[in-house]
Amino acid sequence: MSSLVRPINLGKINHSQSTVKDYILLMKPRVMSLVIFTGFVGMWLAPYSVHPFIAGIAVVCIALGAGSAGAINMWYDRDIDSLMKRTQKRPIVRGVIESDEALSFGLITGFFAVFFMALCVNLLASFLLLFTIFYYICIYTIWLKRRSIQNIVIGGVSGALPPVIGYAAVSNTISLESIILFLIIFIWTPPHSWALALFCNDDYKNCKVPMMPAVKGTLYTKKQILIYSILLFIVSLMPFFIGMNNFIYLIISGILGVVFLYYAGSLFYDTPDNKQAKRFFAYSIFYLFFIFLLLYSTNTISTIS
């Protein structure tokens, strides 16, 4: 099951309608906000010191890198975005930003993000940022998204790298701690995305994007969500057992994980309106945010100074 980019007529571009808000929307601000937060937590957990100004530059570069990838993703996916209810109000589809402008904006933003990360922070963080942008655009968006049922699983590497970038920005290294942060997001991504696919199944079928519910069916998808949720529960406790976080983290993250498992199990009793899938999707966002807030607030190692 696959689809290629199809030429579409987005109508006449009215440049006078373009606003700063449209360019912010082009960068996928909801995704970018989570990227910024997880990247910052990665910096905070690194057992080294860094000047707050340098830390600020690193956060801005991570944000711009995420925005760059989001803009280029919207440029490439403009054909299927026009067919999906969830994405029909994106700037390119609405005709307020021209597709070529979106591509140029994404490329320029990405260049400056990587350049200033290398110039002001360190080369490792810059390389990881460049790799993340490349992976999200080339591996996930262009190659996997329309061709593989494992698009979200393999493509999730890019979304899981921001805390590793943040950690490297402070420490100039990759450690077990940053790998665990990576694993938490990497394992969280499939159940989160498949829950969305459950209640947007018709859209994905219409666009011929091989999301798991559209290819394997809803029951198989729900089983996979439960499996990944169990793995996530296990991995989410690891920060305590390697000494990253204290006992409070273990207790609260354990409770959050049990609730996550409850919502995953409730999918098997979902109604035709996908009420449980929507609840699980909403909770999964809260879960990841709160887990990283816990990682930030209950850490037992050095912080930015």
Swiss-Prot record:
Membrane spanning residue stretches: 31-51, 52-72, 96-118, 123-145, 151-171, 179-199, 225-245, 247-267, 281-301
Pathway assigned in UniProt? Porphyrin-containing compound metabolism; heme O biosynthesis; heme O from protoheme: step 1/1
Q: Gene3D superfamilies, per this entry?
A: UbiA prenyltransferase
Q: Which UniProt keywords apply?
A: Cell inner membrane, Cell membrane, Heme biosynthesis, Membrane, Transferase, Transmembrane, Transmembrane helix
- Where is this protein primarily located? membrane
UniProt key word Transferase: yes
Q: Which GO terms describe its molecular function?
A: protoheme IX farnesyltransferase activity
Record EC number: 2.5.1.141
**Superkingdom of origin:** Bacteria
Q: Which reaction does it catalyse?
A: heme b + (2E,6E)-farnesyl diphosphate + H2O = Fe(II)-heme o + diphosphate
Q: How is this protein positioned relative to the membrane? A: Multi-pass membrane protein
- Any one GO cellular component localisation term in the record: plasma membrane
Stated family: Belongs to the UbiA prenyltransferase family. Protoheme IX farnesyltransferase subfamily.
Q: What does this protein do?
A: Converts heme B (protoheme IX) to heme O by substitution of the vinyl group on carbon 2 of heme B porphyrin ring with a hydroxyethyl farnesyl side group.
Other comments on record = Carbon 2 of the heme B porphyrin ring is defined according to the Fischer nomenclature.
Q: What is this protein called?
A: Protoheme IX farnesyltransferase
Name the gene that codes for it.
Answer: ctaB
